[in-house]
Amino acid sequence: MRATWRGSVTVGLVSFPVRLTPVRQERGVRLHQVHRVDGGRVRHRRVCELCGEELEAADLARGHDSGAGVVLVEDEELAGLRALPSRAVEVVQFSPAGQVDPVLLGRAYYLEPEEPGTGSYSVLREVLERGGLVGIARVPLRGREVVAVVRPRGGVLVLQVLVWAEEVREPDFVVPVAVSGERELGLAASLVGAMTEDFDPAAFPDAYSAGLTRVVADKLAGQRLERQERQRREAGEVRQADETDEAAETEVPEVDIPASRAPGETGGELLAALRRSLERLRGGRR
């Protein structure tokens, strides 16, 4: 896997080199906006909504619309807010894994050890796993500092970026307290027990992506068939033209040739055979 970031993990005075690689991989078919007529990609131009002028990169700035006006923020001002050019996953504390609300968990990366840090890496992973702990770390990513958890996953360590606490909304609704009888609770517990099993993420495939891949593959196959049919048709027209020229030169009279049909085959029999074939195909897919 291609590394997104290279640096080190620091815990107190202990430090070892690592590299970050995304846990999630891009997969499936990607769709783009295209011109329906010729398939050309649609490009979006940068146009000012006030004057209608198309802008170049040098004309662009960042700004915040406060309602009373637009406040421009210059690149130099943003540079002062960005993370220092550190290359360290600085673990600042350890906490019980159960105290990290799953709502806070964001994108995840594998922490891959690099020599000579495999020993320290393995010790940290084992300590976290035995203690049911996660490390809370500050990490410079994509030009700004983020907070992340470092946790064991199987035989490796995973760094998972946390959403900022102030970005999490509390529910703005109240659920009325309902009094549940023992019978209802017992039935619910029985239902939940009957449906309880070990979670296997592979048992829940991405049906949309698989379906989209099939749609695109079928269309590509259809295009190939159409192209082959067109080539055969064009080749047949060329042969027919050559034969016509030869017939004209030798003055061979035209002969009407009746359309051929398989022996004993009638239009109704063919239709019935097609229906039976389709029913057999459908039955095989059930």
UniProtKB/Swiss-Prot annotation:
<feature type="compositionally biased region" description="Acidic residues">
    <location>
        <begin position="243"/>
        <end position="254"/>
    </location>
</feature>
<dbReference type="GO" id="GO:0003690">
    <property type="term" value="F:double-stranded DNA binding"/>
</dbReference>
<keyword id="KW-0227">DNA damage</keyword>
<comment type="subunit">
    <text>Homodimer. Interacts with LigD.</text>
</comment>
<dbReference type="InterPro" id="IPR016194">
    <property type="entry name" value="SPOC-like_C_dom_sf"/>
</dbReference>
<keyword id="KW-0233">DNA recombination</keyword>
<dbReference type="InterPro" id="IPR006164">
    <property type="entry name" value="Ku70/Ku80_beta-barrel_dom"/>
</dbReference>
<comment type="function">
    <text>With LigD forms a non-homologous end joining (NHEJ) DNA repair enzyme, which repairs dsDNA breaks with reduced fidelity. Binds linear dsDNA with 5'- and 3'- overhangs but not closed circular dsDNA nor ssDNA. Recruits and stimulates the ligase activity of LigD.</text>
</comment>
<dbReference type="GO" id="GO:0006310">
    <property type="term" value="P:DNA recombination"/>
</dbReference>
<dbReference type="InterPro" id="IPR009187">
    <property type="entry name" value="Prok_Ku"/>
</dbReference>
<feature type="region of interest" description="Disordered">
    <location>
        <begin position="226"/>
        <end position="270"/>
    </location>
</feature>
<feature type="compositionally biased region" description="Basic and acidic residues">
    <location>
        <begin position="226"/>
        <end position="242"/>
    </location>
</feature>
<keyword id="KW-0234">DNA repair</keyword>
<comment type="similarity">
    <text>Belongs to the prokaryotic Ku family.</text>
</comment>
<keyword id="KW-0238">DNA-binding</keyword>
<dbReference type="Pfam" id="PF02735">
    <property type="entry name" value="Ku"/>
</dbReference>
<protein>
    <recommendedName>
        <fullName>Non-homologous end joining protein Ku</fullName>
    </recommendedName>
</protein>
<dbReference type="GO" id="GO:0006303">
    <property type="term" value="P:double-strand break repair via nonhomologous end joining"/>
</dbReference>
<feature type="domain" description="Ku">
    <location>
        <begin position="10"/>
        <end position="175"/>
    </location>
</feature>
